[in-house]
């Protein structure tokens, strides 16, 4: 069976780490599996895992592939737009530039206060009918050329729409706060009445293919089989919701050896693992950047009697954050489950995968959420007593963030030396390890595939 995994083209590891373990198990069982993600870090990890990564013939994808795969370079850009590849796929440079301009995304103002998947879709380009229509066409073409029997998606609404239009069986892997039955990312407050939404654009395209209208983008993520990450205790949904919980799905290469420096860690002093994810998503500062995680920890922990391991998930460490304090050790990447198990405390940006890593390994956390979806995750960790979070203060632009180092230092000491935090993390770990898992989830996908073939 040919299975295509699609994810939002985000240059970080969050969405990929929930897809790769399942994709690897499906491949091991004899299925042909491919991915679709043009971003730099996902491309690196997908290739390292031995999968093909298919790029739709869409100008924005090709440009993202170039810009997200390398540091911005005018010479490389010029070489690309005059390349044989552009001539072959778009009919030449002028045609490529025309299509790029015609199908450019229309985005709302950047903000760290993202209320829901529907709001996120509006902020990331889906207000433009030409963009959504052309992206959907390109993804439909890719699915057809790959001859996908099943599409497995992690947060790519247009890919879900393309699969529905083609009649492809659709499996979705989502967080509970992405489910249409949820209250979204900011579930502790009522949303304002005037949030941007792409529903008019989506429903116009759906109607042209004879599909039913939707009320919010989240409905596209409700697959023929909907798999919800986590467990009800950490990722609640209304009781009547039709969804299958699959526990923690986390990526770490099999049979990987610990880094050599693991043996140098002193067992008498606490180990703190700081994971920032992508410190800076674009050449300019954006409201969702995670450099605040590193910067605030440097200030708060430089004189603490702890061993700090700092990683960025294959991303570069911004020059302005160096030199690091003497008690810090920097590595671009470490095996996540292995590092979490060796750590006494995690400090991270609130990404769902990072939260799941701590809960699965029973390691308490201090979370510095860099935007609202991550604050949602942080609040769930706090609610089960497995950690605390501190939200950065921001200026009106949302780009300049700050944290009181004394407050962060006190929180780190509290979580590190309060037994109940570690006890609660271990309690949730036992619950989480008893639910779902990669093999069990793969069984469900195979059962679904067989049922659709009858």
Cite the ranges covered by each PLM segment:
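Glycosyltransferase specificity loop/lid
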Residues: 1-156, 160-162, 172-180, 309-342, ...
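A short helix->loop->beta-strand "cap" motif at the edges of active sites that frequently abuts
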Residues: 167-169, 223, 363
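Conserved nucleotide-diphosphate donor binding/catalytic pocket of glycan-assembly enzymes
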Residues: 170-197
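Short, flexible/disordered intra-domain loops and linkers
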Residues: 185-193, 282-290, 396-403
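A nucleotide-sugar donor-handling region in carbohydrate enzymes
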Residues: 191-280, 314
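Short hydrophobic signal-anchor/transmembrane segments that target glycosyltransferases
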Residues: 288-305
């Amino acid at each position: 069976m040919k299975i295509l995994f699609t994810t939002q083209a985000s240059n970080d590891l969050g969405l990929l780490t929930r897809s790769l373990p399942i994709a690897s198990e499906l491949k091991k069982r004899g299925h042909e599996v491919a991915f679709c993600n043009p971003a730099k870090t996902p491309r690196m990890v997908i290739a390292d895992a031995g999968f093909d990564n298919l790029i739709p013939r869409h100008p924005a994808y090709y440009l993202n592939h170039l810009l997200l795969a390398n540091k911005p370079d005018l010479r490389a850009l010029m070489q690309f737009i005059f390349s044989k590849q552009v001539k072959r796929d778009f009919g030449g440079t002028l045609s490529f530039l025309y299509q790029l301009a015609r199908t450019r995304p229309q985005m709302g103002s950047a903000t760290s206060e993202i209320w829901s998947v529907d709001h996120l879709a509006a902020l990331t380009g889906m207000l433009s009918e030409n963009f959504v229509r052309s992206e959907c066409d390109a993804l439909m073409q890719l699915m057809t050329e790959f001859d996908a029997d099943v599409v497995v998606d992690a947060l790519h609404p247009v890919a879900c729409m393309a699969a529905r239009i083609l009649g492809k069986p659709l499996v979705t892997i989502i967080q509970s706060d992405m489910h249409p039955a949820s209250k979204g990312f900011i579930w502790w407050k009522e949303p304002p009445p005037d949030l941007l939404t792409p529903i008019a654009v989506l429903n116009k395209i759906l109607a042209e293919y004879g599909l039913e209208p939707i009320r919010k983008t989240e409905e596209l993520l409700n697959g023929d089989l909907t798999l919800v990450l986590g467990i009800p205790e950490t990722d609640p949904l209304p009781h009547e919701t039709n969804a299958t919980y699959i526990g923690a799905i986390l990526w770490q290469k099999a049979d990987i050896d610990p880094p050599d420096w693991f043996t140098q860690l002193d067992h008498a002093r606490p180990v703190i693992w700081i994971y920032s994810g992508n410190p800076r998503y674009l050449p300019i500062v954006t409201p969702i950047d995670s450099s605040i995680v590193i910067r605030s920890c440097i200030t708060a922990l430089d004189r603490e009697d702890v061993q700090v391991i700092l990683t960025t998930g294959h991303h570069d460490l911004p020059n302005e954050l160096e030199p690091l304090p003497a008690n810090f050790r920097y590595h671009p990447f470490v095996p996540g489950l292995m590092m979490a198990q060796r750590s006494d405390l995690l400090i991270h940006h609130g990404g769902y995968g990072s939260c799941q890593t701590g809960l699965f390994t029973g390691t308490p956390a201090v979370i510095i959420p860099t935007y609202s979806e991550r604050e949602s995750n942080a609040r769930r960790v706090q609610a089960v007593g497995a950690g605390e979070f501190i939200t950065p203060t921001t200026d009106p632009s949302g780009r300049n963030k700050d944290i009181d180092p004394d407050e962060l230092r006190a929180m780190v000491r509290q979580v590190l030396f309060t037994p109940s935090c570690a006890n609660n993390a271990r309690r949730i770990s036992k619950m989480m390890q008893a639910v779902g898992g990669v093999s069990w989830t793969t069984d469900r996908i195979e059962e679904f595939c067989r049922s659709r073939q009858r």
